[in-house]
Regions:
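Domain-level signal for soluble alpha/beta catalytic cores
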Residues: 1-279
């Protein structure tokens, strides 16, 4: 079964406000609410709190904006499951993986804000296995009940630790911000030999030069990093060979409401999604 999650919220908000999403969270909540509803209307069963960039290494008063992003999703918990975004402390693709006191305190404070207000923790794009291991430990010290999903970049560094990721106390292991062909090849090479079919598997599609954007760290130019989509024609062979009962597909940078709607319709037309999974 294929289940859908939302697409890139920052990518959508950035079309209107060229910041990290903090202006919309504080001054235009309706824009965010409408985007969430659009994803749900498409057929998405999971949405994600929009706090990926709300952290002390990015903005002041990060916790204020996290609280506001949490408040916005609460009414939707009657309609779908909410992923609580647990962002990377260090910039993506950086080589810094030091577990400092500031690192620990950020995650302690963040998890205390998320606890009880989300359905699943989504640990996104940390730069190393060491960081993910520490984040999961902090979560479990504070909240021993709510499931954890880890979402990693499909890069060389993470390829060395797929088995170790599966040994963490997590509910699922996803791949983040990746073209379909790259995801498929990475899965076959690194996931498949050690996969735990009891865990949830998923991935985020993208239409962006993710590494170039991440290295630039210029959110005001996010839209300029979008690339032309490549038509995919080999979904069927990949999905039919997966050992999982459920696969979650979402969108990341360059992959918003329009792109998710197109993907859902395409997979439905290919017979890969049952009609009752969609609105």
């Amino acid at each position: 079964m294929i289940t859908f999650m939302d697409g890139g919220m920052l990518f959508e908000l950035n079309k209107v406000y060229t910041d990290y999403g903090e202006y919309a969270v504080e001054n235009n909540k309706q824009l965010i609410i409408d985007l969430y509803q659009s994803y749900i209307d498409i057929g998405c069963k999971y949405i994600t709190t929009c706090n990926y960039c709300f952290k002390p290494t990015k903005i002041k008063q990060w916790d204020k904006y996290v609280k506001k992003s949490i408040d916005i999703v609460q009414p939707f918990r009657q309609k779908c499951k909410v992923f609580g975004c647990v962002p990377p402390y260090y910039d993506s693709y950086s080589n810094n993986n030091n577990i400092t006191e500031e690192f620990v305190m950020y995650y302690v404070d963040l998890i205390n804000l998320l606890k009880g207000n989300i359905d699943i923790y989504l640990v996104e794009t940390a730069t190393s296995f060491i960081e993910v291991e520490q984040i999961c430990r902090i979560i479990r010290d504070i909240d021993n009940d709510t499931p954890i999903i880890v979402s990693i970049y499909p890069n060389e560094n993470n390829s060395k630790y797929i088995k170790e990721y599966y040994e963490l106390p997590i509910y699922g292991l996803f791949m983040n911000c990746v073209p379909f062909d790259t995801m498929k090849d990475y899965y076959s090479k690194y996931f498949k030999p050690v996969v735990n079919k009891k865990m949830l598997f998923g991935f985020y599609c993208n239409y962006i030069n993710e590494k170039a954007y991440a290295l630039s760290q210029d959110v005001s130019k996010l839209q300029s990093f979008k690339i032309l989509p490549k038509k995919e024609n080999n979904y069927e062979d990949f999905f039919k060979d997966l050992p999982f009962n459920d696969v979650v597909i979402g969108g990341c940078c360059g992959y918003g409401v329009k792109e998710m709607r197109s993907l859902v319709n395409e997979l439905k037309n290919k017979g890969l999604v049952s009609g009752d999974s969609l609105k």
